[in-house]
Amino acid sequence: MRMKENAMKNGQLKPAYNVQHVVDAEYITWLTVAPELTDITTFIPFLKRIEKNSNFKYLKIVDDARYESEENYSFIEENNQISFIKPSNYEISKTRKYKNDISRIDNMDYYSESDLFICQNGKKLIANWIKIRKSKTGYESVKTIYICEDCSNCNYKESMH
């Protein structure tokens, strides 16, 4: 696992592990150590180990933004659990700059019946293609890529990229 630079700044690999724990009513009820670099990939195996070894399934999962991923949300939903995971962009999404950024898809109107967005200039962003990405855990994430039908003579074009 690569860790922060040491005083020599030589960036060498150092032995390290990712420690995860569960707290229930102020007591640590489960602990695991994993070699994975990020918390995202430790989440599902961690929950499975808890259920397998303790014969108990937590119905409400509370975590921080380090665990936020489509794969983790899908797992929680498939297992009839409820997630309280803080979105990774939560703090920045509250800023004025974020809310006024017209290039963000979050700040456009979405029409589900037509599967399209309307930009600041009133133009349609239509679904152009589907991108499928497979994670190292094997989970397939499907993303729809949208393009503007006509960006010619758009006053907002420069701020959209």
Predicted region positions:
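Anion-binding and metal-coordination hotspots
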Residues: 1-161
